């Protein structure tokens, strides 16, 4: 679900544990055409709250990865994977025939890598995945905060 939160674009994914993509910012705003995009991903439920800062080069193709999953709505064999520039956000996708299961990994940054948190969300193939890809694309293309 796409929404506005504190005057910035937010994407929410999931049910029992909600993933929230928010606070898009340029890492080096003084550099013209800076490709380094940072954003926060927060995983929250009644029992847990985890937040990680994610560094990408113009989104690292997360929206394209999700769009390709949507296009392959009939299914695929095995896992498909994606990771952000510094590995602070990972995503693996599995198609069961009836659902697409996305396992989102939030990771501590190197060199410590002391913790990681994973949550799996289920999505209907096709339109549901296409909507998610579109929401992530709109988020990554939105105006970064200063």
Task: Identify the function of each model-found stretch.
Residues 1-48, 54-55, 139-146:
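Charged, alpha-helix-forming regions
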Residues 13-14, 20-24, 42-44, 53-57, ...:
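A structural detector for beta-sheet-dominated domains
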Residues 15-17, 46-50, 87, 98, ...:
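Short acidic/polar mixed-charge low-complexity motifs
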Residues 32-34, 48-62, 119-130:
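Short, low-complexity cationic-aromatic patches
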Residues 33-38, 81, 89-113:
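Intrinsic, low-complexity N-terminal interaction/targeting segments
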Residues 74-89, 142-146:
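Short glycine-rich, low-complexity/disordered patches
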């Amino acid at each position: 679900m796409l929404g506005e939160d504190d005057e910035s674009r937010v994407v929410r994914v999931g049910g029992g544990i909600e993933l929230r993509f928010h606070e898009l910012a340029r890492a080096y705003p003084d550099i013209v055409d800076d490709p380094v995009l940072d954003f926060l991903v927060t995983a929250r439920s009644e029992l847990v709250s985890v937040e990680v800062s994610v560094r990408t080069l113009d989104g690292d193709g997360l929206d394209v990865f999700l769009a390709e999953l949507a296009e392959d709505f009939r299914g695929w064999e095995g896992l498909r994977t994606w990771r952000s520039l510094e590995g602070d956000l990972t995503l693996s996708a599995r198609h069961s025939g009836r659902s697409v299961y996305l396992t989102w990994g939030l990771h501590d940054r190197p060199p410590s890598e002391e913790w990681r948190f994973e949550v799996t969300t289920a999505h209907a193939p096709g339109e549901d995945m296409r909507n998610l890809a579109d929401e992530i694309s709109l988020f990554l293309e939105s105006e970064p905060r200063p």
